[in-house]
Amino acid sequence: MKKETLKNIFDFLEEKENKKHKDNGSLKWKLFFNKSITKEELNVNGDLNLRGLKIKSLPEGLKVGGNLDLKESEIQSLPEGLKVGGDLILIDSKLKSLPEGLKVGGELDLYWSRELTSLPKTLKAEGDLNLGTCTSLTSLPKGFKVGGRLNLSHCENLTSLPEGLEVGGSLWLIESWGLKSLPKGLYVGGSLHIQRSNLTNFSDDEIRDMIKPGFIEGKIYR
């Protein structure tokens, strides 16, 4: 398909979106064909939907006020200091790491990103963080905090959690067989889910004693 035809398709689809997103079609076209991008275009006020776009990287200085959808995009790296005001969707990504200074105001969804090995110390996850089935993940940063829920289910190579881990919502550790204990100072603002894991060897009281001076606000599901 000719480049002109692809651009016309982008432009046509963009006309059907809300006015606040009207410049994003041009940005998507430039990203797809690796064209130069202005500073103004790097500041996206609304959502930026790049789902399925065959790109491997994003430009430095990109800021998205709404959601950034990169599912099925073949993305291999993200720029340092990337800021997303809404959700950052990276389901089934090929990312091996995340950049320093990444800030996500909504949900950071990395479900099934099986090449991801670690998270940066400077990551700010203000909403939910979905790391379910990130099978290469081996650790979390010391003093890590998640504003919402944290899903670590099916993270088979995760063998420990850092002391002082804070989770604003519920914590899922279903079938994370590598975990044989929980750290001191763990705080969970919601419930704890340990179904089909080695943590079911401990009683509820033993788990709550194990994490002191930490605390689990909700129930423990086993």
Residue positions per predicted region:
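Generic N-terminal leader/processing signal
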Residues: M1, T5, E14-K20, S26-K28, ...
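N-terminal capping/linker segments that flank leucine-rich repeat
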Residues: M1-R51, N198, D204-R222
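Concave beta-strand-loop units of leucine-rich repeat
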Residues: W29-L31, G46-I55, G65-I75, G85-L95, ...
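The feature encodes a structural signal of leucine-rich repeats
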Residues: I37-K39, I55-P59, I75-E80, L95-E100, ...
